[in-house]
C-alpha cells in the first residue's frame, strides 16, 4: 500500500515515516509549501536521508486565503481564531490530502497524536484521543469528515512523546533532541504585530459594566476575552476583558469572576459520526485546547445553535474558539463558540 506522509521536517512526521516503512508500506514524503519564507528544504533533506521519495505541493495561495486571511478577519471582528483547526480541515486534510491521492497514494499519514478506528455497527470512522494526554491533538481534528478519516493514518496515536523521542534516538536522528515550537506556524512572534498591517482598527473606549469610560484601547483586533495584561487601565483592582463589541468599537472590562459561566452556546456543529447524535446527552467538553475537560449536557436550541450546560462554570469561553466534546476517548464533535 502506498502512503504519503505529510513531512514538516520535525521529529513527529519523520518517526511516522520510519514506522510506516518498517511496517511494510511504500512511503513517500509529501511537504506543503505554505509560507513565502520556506520551501520544504529541511523535509526534503530528511526524506533523502531516509531514502524515501519526496514531493512538494505549493499551497501558498489557498493557505493565505483559508487560514491567514481568516485569522486576521476573525480578530478584526473581535473573535479569537483557531487557525490549526481551519488548516487541518481545509488545507492539510483537504487540498493536500487530495493532492496526495492524485499522486497515487492510497492513504495519507501525519504525525498527529490522535487515533482512528472503524465501528462496524455504525459503519463510521471514529476519531479518538492520542494515548499521551499531554500531546493529544484530537481537539484540532474534530472537523474532519468521514471521507477524510477513511484515508488517514496517525502512526503516533498509540505512543507517548518520550517514546517517540526514544525511537528517534534509536534511529540516530539528530532532531530527537530538538525543542518543539509552541507558536502558530506562520507567526514567529506576537500575533498583534503580525496582523497589524492586515487589519483595520482604531482606538476606542474601555468601559466598565455601568458604562463608565475607564480608558482607551488600541483597536479591537488586539484584545481577547479574559485578557488582563496590556490593558493600561488604572482602576485599583485587576480588570479583565469581558466582552468585545466591534460595531461600537468598545471593550467591556470587569472582575475575573464575571468571566465564569456554566452556559455556552456554539454554532457550526460538526459530528464525527452522524449516528452519534442520539447518544449526545451527557458529554465531556473542553472550550480551548489547553482547557480541562468538564462534564456537560448538550442539546440543540434551534437550527445550528447548540448549547452546553456544564456541571462546573467555565472561564472565558471565547467567541471564535472551538468547543469539542467527547465520550471517553472518542471525539463526538464540536463547533465554534459565539
From Swiss-Prot:
This protein's UniProt keywords: ATP-binding, Cytoplasm, Disulfide bond, Nucleotide-binding, RNA-binding, Transferase, tRNA processing, tRNA-binding
Binding residue positions for ATP: 6-13, 32, 111
Record-annotated active site: 87 (nucleophile), 185 (cysteine persulfide intermediate)
Pfam families given in the database record: tRNA_Me_trans (PF03054), tRNA_Me_trans_C (PF20258), tRNA_Me_trans_M (PF20259)
GO molecular function terms listed in the Swiss-Prot or TrEMBL record: ATP binding; tRNA binding; tRNA-uridine 2-sulfurtransferase activity
InterPro entries reported in the protein's UniProt record: MnmA-like, MnmA-like_C, MnmA-like_central, MnmA-like_central_sf, Rossmann-like_a/b/a_fold
Catalysed transformations (reactions): S-sulfanyl-L-cysteinyl-[protein] + uridine(34) in tRNA + AH2 + ATP = 2-thiouridine(34) in tRNA + L-cysteinyl-[protein] + A + AMP + diphosphate + H(+)
Disulfide bonds: 87-185
EC class name: transferase
Record keyword Secreted present: no
Record keyword tRNA-binding present: yes
UniProt EC number: 2.8.1.13
Residue segments, region Interaction with tRNA: 135-137, 288-289
Protein location: Cytoplasm
GO cellular component term of the entry, any: cytoplasm
BP terms from Gene Ontology: tRNA wobble position uridine thiolation
Record-linked CDD domains: MnmA_TRMU-like
Principal location class: cytoplasm
PANTHER family: MITOCHONDRIAL TRNA-SPECIFIC 2-THIOURIDYLASE 1, TRNA 5-METHYLAMINOMETHYL-2-THIOURIDYLATE -METHYLTRANSFERASE
HAMAP family associated with the record: tRNA_thiouridyl_MnmA
Stated role: Catalyzes the 2-thiolation of uridine at the wobble position (U34) of tRNA, leading to the formation of s(2)U34.
The family this protein is said to belong to: Belongs to the MnmA/TRMU family.
Matching NCBIfam families: PRK00143.1, trmU
Name this polypeptide is given: tRNA-specific 2-thiouridylase MnmA
Organism expressing this protein natively: Syntrophomonas wolfei subsp. wolfei (strain DSM 2245B / Goettingen)
Gene that this polypeptide is encoded by: mnmA
